[in-house]
Amino acid sequence: MELGWWPQLGLAFLQLLLISSLPREYTVINEACPGAEWNIMCRECCEYDQIKCECPGKKEVVGYTIPCCRNEENECDSCLIHPGCTIFENCKTCRNGSWGGTLDDFYVKGIYCAECRAGWYGGDCMRCGQVLRVPKGQILLESYPLNAHCEWTIHAKPGFIIQLRIVMLSLEFDYMCQYDYVEVRDGDSSDSQIIKRFCGNERPAPIRSTGSSLHILFHSDGSKNFDGFHAIFEEITACSSSPCFHDGTCLLDSTGSYKCACLAGYTGKHCENLLEERNCSDPGGPVNGYKKITGGPGLIHGHYAKIGTVLTFFCNSSYVLSGNEMRTCQQNGEWSGKQPICIKACREPKISDLVRRKVLPMQVQSRETPLHQLYSSAFSKQKLQDAPTKKPVLPFGDLPPGYQHLHTQLQYECISPFYRRLGSSRRTCLRTGKWSGRAPSCIPICGKTENVSAPKTQGTRWPWQAAIYRRAGGVHGGGLHKDAWFLVCSGALVNERTVVVAAHCVTDLGRVTVIKTADLKVVLGKFYRDDDRDEKSIQSLRISAIILHPNYDPILLDMDIAILKLLDKARMSTRVQPICLAAPRDLSTSFQESRITVAGWNVLADSRSPGYKDDMLRSGVVRVADSLLCEEQHEAQGIPVSVTDSMFCAGRDPTAPSDICTAETGGIAAVSFPGRASPEPRWHLVGLVSWSYDKTCSHSLSTAFTKVLPFKDWIERNMK
């Protein structure tokens, strides 16, 4: 007996030596001891040591805290010397979470996991299971340790059942599911009737309870572990039990009861009865057309169609479908819609926005024609009485938009009096499915103006006169604001998108470099020099392109002509209309004998002068001068020039009043004579002011013009 305590004392002494050899991290003085089990040999205080140790066999370093007590010599005695304490008792790991043991939470309270995997909870992340009373939710068990045991109980509201779907399953497989498994019972306890056990990784079909609760048990043995499982559940109603047969659809009403919507061929409360199968007879294709099966099961023996068959109808060329394009075989054995017919018709021809169309009453051909009467006169009265006299009946029906019946007539006219029509004024739908005549179009009436009394032309508003402006930012000097616009010359509007102008107006001086389109603009409908006077009537248009004549010589100003393409169409009105183009052969008299009217603004006018606001478009009459005399006049002024074949010189007509200084306007020259389209006089463009030397605007000096007549073909090619 006396020797029996020596082994115990020796073991305790060895433990103390072992503890003293371990590194001490820190010591915490706690005024309250953790519990009665630690009060043996404890005095008024209780301290803790944090210990690091290495688990046997795993070489895994873990930590924990142990309490210690002060002895009579004020030394801290580890409580490991007491019975029941072993150094590796708490050498644990967090199998279902992340390590997080701190101070006494690790050893005393057992909380050594900072965060648990989904489905696990507790300080050691080993607790699982729950009682659930929600309409829907999920059960997720992420991974699992050995020898785990978890239970869940799901409760639904009275009158509802529970549907459980296992969407992920990863457990140890066994044919009997006796190692790792999920067990579902129809009730609220482990004694309820078992529905089935599940293991492996094959997801089962949805599970439904017969009552308002389900019990789920998870169990794992001590050999293997996998990823766990994930299930979702929800409360369901009477329809969830699939009371409708043959793929019928269950529909709940407000009272909680249900009705079944049956598929084709079934009837009854639960869609349990089979209807007698019905078919639709083949409707055939329309005359001058055909049909195709475009949906459903199709025809039976080529004569009958099953329920749901869809037919689509088509017409031959020059015929149009009137009626239902598609028909479906219905439950009652009848086709939907009405049988369509194919009608001879014409597609409406496309017209521009400038053309107005009117549909005239159809003129149906009959036997009451002069030819028929002549033919009938050769026969007896008896034979004539036997001949049909009624007008033939045409297959009328509703046509889709954009089509017209046979013999329909369309009448065309221009929407504005400032346009004239080209093409046919009336077209008829022919039996060929085409329209008679030519497609109509409307073009602006050119060269027409009012209130011009020759030879006096002052104060006339020439509607084709175009003012060409240039932005001051592209010109050096002059004292103009950077964004200001100034008038550089005049041009002639020849159609809705084209203006003819002298080439030197839109190029840099002495060069063929074209000014940027953004630095130029065209103003139409202008009369006064001051823009504010014409504010309501003018149209300010942007330029999309500038086309110089390829042979333009900026030094001699030979072929000084260019075309401006407008970005937007000019709107025709009494103030804006184009001028006509003419070839030399169109002139009724010799060009040299023509009285030519020149119009333009004074581009050099000073806006600060008193009469600036009242200054208007000026015009006057000139006559063609001899080219040799023109050259000699300028040579006498010290300016040797050459008048080429693309130019003509002209001076003021002393017999006609004039308020224009031709050299200052950069204007246009026009002649009035009857045109080809109308015997009425029309104004035609014949010239553009090109160059001159005339500081005093005297009658003796001539101005050089670009002759427009030779460039008619080039202009028309670029007008398209």
Swiss-Prot record:
Pfam families annotated for this entry?
CUB (PF00431), EGF (PF00008), Sushi (PF00084), Trypsin (PF00089)
Keyword Secreted attached: yes
Disulphide bonds in the chain: C128-C150, C177-C199, C239-C250, C244-C260, C262-C271, C280-C329, C315-C342, C414-C442, C489-C505, C630-C649, C661-C697
Which residues are sugar-modified?
N451
| Signal sequence range | 1-21
Tell me the domain of life: Eukaryota
Keywords on record: Disulfide bond, EGF-like domain, Glycoprotein, Repeat, Secreted, Serine protease homolog, Signal, Sushi
Residue span, Peptidase S1 domain: 445-720
Q: Sorted alphabetically, which PROSITE patterns does this protein's record hold?
A: CUB, EGF_1, EGF_2, EGF_3, SUSHI, TRYPSIN_DOM
User: CDD domains recorded for this chain?
Assistant: CCP (cd00033), CUB (cd00041), EGF_CA (cd00054), Tryp_SPc (cd00190)
- In what residue span(s) does the EGF-like domain sit? 235-272
Domain Sushi, by residue range, is 278-344, 387-444
InterPro entries according to UniProt: CUB_dom, EGF-like_Ca-bd_dom, EGF-like_dom, Peptidase_S1_PA, Peptidase_S1_PA_chymotrypsin, Peptidase_S1A, Serine_Protease_S1-Domain, Sperma_CUB_dom_sf
Give the GO molecular function terms. Answer: calcium ion binding
Q: List each copy of the CUB domain by range.
A: 128-236
Q: Where in the cell does this protein reside?
A: Secreted
GO CC terms for this protein? extracellular region
> Which Gene3D superfamilies does this chain map to?
Complement Module, domain 1 (2.10.70.10), Laminin (2.10.25.10), Spermadhesin, CUB domain (2.60.120.290), Trypsin-like serine proteases (2.40.10.10)
Q: Which PANTHER family match?
A: INACTIVE SERINE PROTEASE PAMR1 (PTHR24254:SF9), PROTHROMBIN (PTHR24254)
- Relate the protein's function as given in its record: May play a role in regeneration of skeletal muscle.
What family does the database annotate?
Answer: Belongs to the peptidase S1 family.
Name the record gives this protein? Inactive serine protease PAMR1
What is the species of this protein? Bos taurus (Bovine)
